[in-house]
Amino acid sequence: MKFLKAKGSLLSSGIYLIALAPFVNAKCALPSTYSWTSTDALATPKSGWTALKDFTDVVSNGKHIVYASTTDTQGNYGSMGFGAFSDWSDMASASQTATSFSAVAPTLFYFQPKSIWVLAYQWGSSTFTYRTSQDPTNVNGWSSEQALFTGKISGSSTGAIDQTVIGDDTNMYLFFAGDNGKIYRSSMSINDFPGSFGSQYEEILSGATNDLFEAVQVYTVDGGEGDSKYLMIVEAIGSTGHRYFRSFTASSLGGEWTAQAASEDQPFAGKANSGATWTDDISHGDLVRNNPDQTMTVDPCNLQLLYQGHDPNSNSDYNLLPWKPGVLTLKQ
């Protein structure tokens, strides 16, 4: 846009500022306390599945692409992808397609330096594995699997689980849990990705088992500065057994993490602040990103969390619970 010089400094300056106003992007800081509204359950597992859970979501070409874990009536795990949809209200009618391979607790993102989509997951041929594709909407169009991480952790009944992958300008980072009160990290040069992180890792958070249980996710905060440049959420188990999320922040992906909204009564997201009436559990999911790439960027002005919940009256074994998707939207 071209601006013409005008006489009369006050009037011309006012017009100039008004003209510029629409081009100024508002920036929001992460809140110190969180309060949400919630949808009802958004989709029901198709016949043969008892649960849809462990969601990963990207928005590409204006549509949500969601992958998830499934369980059957015996508690066996598998994985699936939804047909791409524009609005959360469309999720119920979106197709549900089983993957021809088991990609449990998936992480989906676009690796921009190599122009390739990556699907990472657990319980493949390595501790964590990945596949690549040019079209993530083709649920069974993925490459053969490759090793993402080969390390083993001790002091865990599950082993390493619930990975997430994120990158900055120079490195890619792998974060994961172990149902044991610890969060772990591994890293590699971004130039070597996609590839294996190898077997080395470090323990970056340690606490009570129920306080740092599983489902770790890490994000770049759009416009974030200082200690709030990066956001981590970790699933915890509350005093009555219900699941909720605690949050942590950091100034760098390779740095130290500081607790932010980390108590059961003032969590990042949980029964205390979710606004959900159909579930008492806010469990394994993914913040909606404003960029599908490896930076895992979220907009603090428009935070939404795709999560798994279930009917509070269902008291089955964890792997038989009827988990379904719901979405939280942060109150502004």
From Swiss-Prot:
EC code: 3.2.1.55
Pfam families per the UniProt record, alphabetical: Glyco_hydro_62
Coiled-coil zones: none
Cell compartment(s), UniProt: Secreted
Known catalytic reactions: Hydrolysis of terminal non-reducing alpha-L-arabinofuranoside residues in alpha-L-arabinosides
Signal peptide location: 1-26
Regulation: induction: Mainly expressed when grown on xylan and much less on L-arabitol, L-arabinose and D-xylose. Expression is under the control of the carbon catabolite repressor creA.
CDD domains reported in the protein's UniProt record: GH62
Source species, domain of life: Eukaryota
UniProt entry tagged with the keyword S-adenosyl-L-methionine: no
Record GO terms (molecular function): alpha-L-arabinofuranosidase activity
Function: Alpha-L-arabinofuranosidase involved in the hydrolysis of xylan, a major structural heterogeneous polysaccharide found in plant biomass representing the second most abundant polysaccharide in the biosphere, after cellulose. Releases L-arabinose from arabinoxylan.
Protein name, as recorded: Alpha-L-arabinofuranosidase axhA
Protein source organism: Aspergillus niger
Taxonomic placement: Eukaryota, Fungi, Dikarya, Ascomycota, Pezizomycotina
